[in-house]
Amino acid sequence: MATPQSDTSLSPAASPLRTVAVVGLGTMGTGIAEVLARAGRDVIGIDVSETAAARCVAALEASTARAVERGRLTEEERARTLARVTTSTDLAAAAGADLVVEVVPESYELKQQIFRELDGIVRPETILATGTNALSVTRLAADSARPERVLGLHFFNPAPAMRLVEIASSVLTAPQAVAAVTDLVLDLGKEPVSIGDRPGFIADGLLFGYLNQAAAMYESRYASREDIDAAMRLGCGLPMGPLALLDLIGIDTARTVLEAMYAASHDRLHAPAPILKQLSEAGLTGRKAGRGFYTYEAPGSGTVVPDDLTPREDGPRTPGRPVRSVGVAGSGTMASGIAEVFAKAGYEVVLAARSEEKARAAKARIGKSLSRSVDKGRLTAEAAAQALDRITPTGTCDDFADVDLAVEAVAEDLEVKRQLFATLDKVCKPGAVLATTTSSLPVVACARATSRPRDVIGMHFFNPAPAMKLVEVVRTVLTADDVHATVREVCGKIRKHAVDCGDRAGFIVNALLFPYLNNAVKMVQEHYASLDDIDTAMKLGGGYPMGPFELLDVVGLDVSLAIEKVLHEEFRDPGLAPAPLLEHLVAAGCLGRKTGRGFREYAKR
């Protein structure tokens, strides 16, 4: 087997990588060519198709023209950028390149053929980079005559806009090659993350498991495509929902990546959901085909058009029950936030805590929150005062006797919630809707603690409730249609986006979010990547507002572990077992920001 060799010709000073050949001029190859040319590199674009080469030139002309219109390039800079790019249909055009980047379709045979041909064309010191995100860099390197000069260079789409670049080394790659390419990536204005070789690397390794679970969730008819996507956008702050993202990536591409990941991990979470195979083989591969999970205006269009699965607004509806007053049980952050939301929407609110003192303290916190909204110009002083006046604090749920909707927001403990629901059953009037805000416990267990299970439903708000737009509406097998309709109508009146889901662990958001977080912990546990690199990769490559470890420390490691245990117990999938590292940190009392230490340490206030 070949081993990495020391080669001074690979030092950054000796090899500044001024000329780069890009093999494969599809969307990604064209984007990479633009990035390189705008950074002053001479680019040789190579594709066997003259049509693809012509499309590349046209796309570069259009893209740089838009950059001029937006003030990001001058006309002179545009002309220089375009002049740096030449195209060819002959791989021999790469002979003078310092670096060759291949971004051809994900096929070992095709990539190996290109690398073998390049071995006989390029100079001995030339570095060969594969743009794969699914195939083994090591296998490609081992088949090359220069394994020490082969590495992975994974840009994200669209390459001109996305800052992250993953640089993947095999066990054969020379450190000097990695250093030279890292310097180039920095010079391009990108954020390099250096990693080892495994399918998916960091970003796609975490992202595609999540996308696969979303596809499986949709396939099981647990929730609609619109609700799954809305839940992840509004509940996690993601720029796109998972099913829309699969359509953008290409369902066939996602299937290929997942097949490679499953072959390496044998983790059921990576086994492609059957619907991905069905859609791929039917040619319904997403936006590029004009249809995937959604239907588009035309192939290549991003405009979604209605189809047979689009929810109809004009269909028959079950009328909801009238709701004028709301009881909120609890005095913590979530209960206070929910009470504020209802009061601002014009509802009379009874806020019940374990003592009247706690209830008054919760109302005082709501007053401060309303004052902050006034200071930020989001609310008038008069509206804030009126909202606060609508809240009546009390130390007993007996004062819920006349409310139309009772919302439980106490500790995430099933026995505590069941006891409270037994109390609500006794004190609330007939016909009152009883809702739990649980994020992971079975709603039906709360319902069975009452003599009126048809009146019980889940209303999972997200924290902070006044700011977060999402509410997961959770029907049990016993929930009455008019109770479901009531909660949907109430969500509209309090300006929340309601998504429907069934009563199973994690509902939509947590069932998709926490396995992703758990897999990030496993990555660190296996010493594949650092906390910082993983957080950077998911923010810059996945569009997440926070990296997984930033989020875990905010949520609380104990809370996260509890949710992951519930998911594992319900679905009994070995891949959902909580990472031992997470369990060890919780056992040590390192719970995140609230204790000053979690995955990171925080300054004490």
Regions found by a protein language model. Give the residues of each.
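Rossmann-like NAD(P)-binding element
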Residues: 67-127, 357-358, 372-433, 441
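NAD(P)-binding Rossmann-fold cofactor-contacting core
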Residues: 41-73, 347-379
